[in-house]
Amino acid sequence: GKTLRIIMPVLNVAFVGSESLAKKIAKKGDVRDIESYVYKEERNGEIGIISLLRPLKHPEKIRPLLSVLNVAKVGIIEISKVDSALGEICVSFGCAKIEKGLVIINSQVGDWVDPEQVRIILEQSGLKNWELFEQLPDEHSIREKLFSFMDNLEREVSSLILPVDQFFNVKGVGLVAIGYVQSGTVSKHDTIQVLPADENGIVRSLQVMDDDVDTAISGDRVGLAIRNLREEALHRGCMVVHANSNVLNKNLSSTLSIIKAPFQKRVLQIGDVIHAAV
């Protein structure tokens, strides 16, 4: 059925932890490389939405984690043991400049996690302002903390940026592009521009979590049915923006300054191949 959406405040939370804790906090949505959990509550006369984005396959794959960090404003890290994967997670959040978050120690039977050791890791990885829970709080307390973060974040009025991670042709629908809305909103009948191909199309319809919607908002994983666009214009990693928004500039070459991350042992050498999440 058709779902009418009023633009509501949404808090995107990068969640690294167990499926069981995520399910307590919010309702599970679609699953690919990233699980999504959504919780809605009316507060002060408007609906607030908490959207947990839980990357899968870490530490084997870093890409889902980086995709989540690109759209998240705050974070939750659930700790069952201290290992190198935890260090990588904390450094990733620190490098992504996610300054607000909750760290929850939830050690399993027989595995004790030292809160002081965790505090040191947080301090060293740039997460010293995160709140540490030495034992698992109830889900209501976690939600209240997240809503307080939402209340303190400035409401952004930002332009549409939607990186595409897959696309295909659907019989009877046509060309469909799928990705997370990194910022802004996109609506039915909008004229969109695909970069770097620099070709325009029109949004025929949108689906979020298998519902037809009129508008998709920041943090949504959306399927965009597009007409008047060549399939060749799309590729994995291409960007969808509003036509004539000039929100992205084309650069043929860029100069980067690299800040050394905490715990980084290697120094970059000429000829090294690096993977960048921008």
Task: Give the ranges of each region predicted by the language model.
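Switch II (G3) loop of P-loop NTPases
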Residues: 44-61, 77-80
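Conserved G1/Walker A P-loop phosphate-binding module
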Residues: 3-45
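Switch- and interface-adjacent substructures of P-loop NTPase systems
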Residues: 37-46, 51, 69-72
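Exposed beta-strand and adjacent loop surfaces of beta-rich binding modules
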Residues: 189-191, 271-275
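Conserved C-terminal guanine-recognition region of P-loop GTPase G domains, centered on the G4
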Residues: 62-129
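Conserved catalytic-core segments of large NTP-driven translation/proteostasis enzymes
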Residues: 125, 129-233, 239-243, 247-260
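Short Lys/Arg-enriched alpha/beta "domain-start" segment
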Residues: 47, 265-266
